[in-house]
Amino acid sequence: MALLQIAEPGQSSAPHQHKLAAGIDLGTTNSLVASVRSGTASTLVDSQGRSILPSVVNYGADATRVGYPAREQAETDPHNTVISVKRLLGRSLQDINQRYPHLPYRFKASEKGLPIVQTAQGDKNPIQISADILKALAERATATLGGELAGVVITVPAYFDDAQRVATKDAAALAGLHVLRLLNEPTAAAIAYGLDSGQEGVIAVYDLGGGTFDISILRLSRGVFEVLATGGDSALGGDDFDHLIADHLQAQIGLTSLTAEQQRALINAATQAKIDLTEYMTAELNVLGWQGSLTREELENLIAPLLKKTLLSCRRALKDAGVEADEVLEVVMVGGSTRTPFVREQVGEFFGRTPLTSINPDEVVAIGAAIQADILAGNKPDAEMLLLDVIPLSLGIETMGGLVEKIIPRNTTIPVARAQEFTTFKDGQTAMSVHVVQGEREMVDDCRSLARFSLKGIPPMAAGAAHIRVTYQVDADGLLSVTALEKSTGVQAEIQVKPSYGLSDDEVTQMLKDSMAYAKEDMLARALAEQRVEADRVIEGLVSALQADGDELLNEQERQTLLQAIERLIELRNGDNADAIEQGIKDTDKASQDFASRRMDKSIRSALAGHSVDEI
């Protein structure tokens, strides 16, 4: 059975053409870049030997600073220093204000309601800010590797939605990077440990970073990772450990209130104590004129409630995944906070096995991304990692007006299943034709037809009342199954096709080029088709209503006014001006409002006929 085409269009896999590629962990608190050199994946360091780049950007009046120099400006220049921009990616300003009401930035909304940070250098959106972090990482990689990057793999949380993933890719494009793939962070961690070539089964990835906690339950089947469930807490991380220790120290010192400088000094001391206690049983402290110590046991008592919260999230994720803790084969630890021995002990006890900790937990995600990038760049043509199988072109369905509704976007890793609900267009419709297409264009005529089948036995209902759930499922062998199910009766039909059969790399490349070349033209054609479909719906509905109730509820003049509105809309519908059709629909709706109200009153009277007030 032929697999889906898994090579990127135009990619060369010739062994002598070694390409420079990198894996990027674009993190909430810190970011890293890694690459495979001499067959080994490792993180790339800056001029001072540091692999970590703080995910902080300062837009000062004099310069843009990224990383450590930017972090130093956080206290003195908070309005122009953006920390944890990853939290803002792909979100509306309204959403951000609800989730993070205490951010120090000066926000304003774009025309589409997206957040814009007002800085000394002008307006900056989250994509631009993320791009500056990516540029800094790319410059480090270029300097270290001695050449331009052919492509990168960027990791994202497994729970990132489409908007957040698109925003991440846009940021990379703005940074001048070619994205080979977006890779789920837990999958990257599993790849770093070589679990993709190990025993099949369930893997847990416990990710406790500086500001967030994520738990992911994965299933490895035939070399392909499937995300079964995710969970966590976007406001719980190692920073919270530091604050608990700082509060404890404040109580020990006997201070009731603190200046900002004292608070920062306590936090720094707390962070250092936490680090020391990963190796020693006691940490000595000298802060704000106070000398004392903190034991590992005291630390464990302080952080136990937070750790319990993470384990509750693990329990929920296992329940969502439908698996028991003892079914988990391996537990991968990610994030600097998992260095704490108590964290490792508690997680090990919960899952009943020793977690994997041999790879630096700060670096494990970037290393996994680097391994994936090396393969995608064509440097390992014989690699057997089936995780590379992707949908080469989007899979969609034809809707009214010859439009394409994409169900599974291109570059989605397989296996995958996606479902969407559709409804009937006409009153009394008892069958629906399902047309499966492949391609990136907006209109069916410009895409490749894969299959057609019919769903029959839909109960006669008013247009829009039926609920038909269409599911697209692509298995690890690239076999597409399409199922259509009418929800009220359970009637269903299905078909199986091989979506990539008969397409060469050149044909795929050409289809992608066409989608870009005709993008504007396609969107205009789609807008016109959508307005025509809506006009048809309005015309058909109004004609049907006039036939049913026009004689009873309208006088001749009112009837003629509506008929003229319908004729005008039909004339506009047959034209090529989408805006004119849209206005015609609005005018027709306005002209028919009184008629619609009378029909509603009639329906209510009919429903109440023969019933007393007490019955109602």
UniProtKB/Swiss-Prot annotation:
One of the record's GO cellular component terms: cytosol
InterPro entries: ATPase_NBD (IPR043129), Heat_shock_70_CS (IPR018181), HscA_NBD (IPR042039), HSP70_C_sf (IPR029048), HSP70_peptide-bd_sf (IPR029047), Hsp_70_fam (IPR013126), ISC_FeS_clus_asmbl_HscA (IPR010236)
Molecular function via GO: ATP binding; ATP hydrolysis activity; ATP-dependent protein folding chaperone; heat shock protein binding; protein folding chaperone; unfolded protein binding
Pfam families named among the record's database cross-references: HSP70
Keywords: ATP-binding, Chaperone, Nucleotide-binding
Top-level taxonomic group: Bacteria
Single GO BP term: protein refolding
Described purpose of this protein according to its UniProt entry: Probable chaperone. Has a low intrinsic ATPase activity which is markedly stimulated by HscB.
NCBIfam families xref list: HscA (TIGR01991), PRK05183.1 (NF003520)
HAMAP family in alphabetical order: HscA (MF_00679)
Family according to the record: Belongs to the heat shock protein 70 family.
Protein name per UniProt: Chaperone protein HscA homolog
Designated gene of the protein: hscA
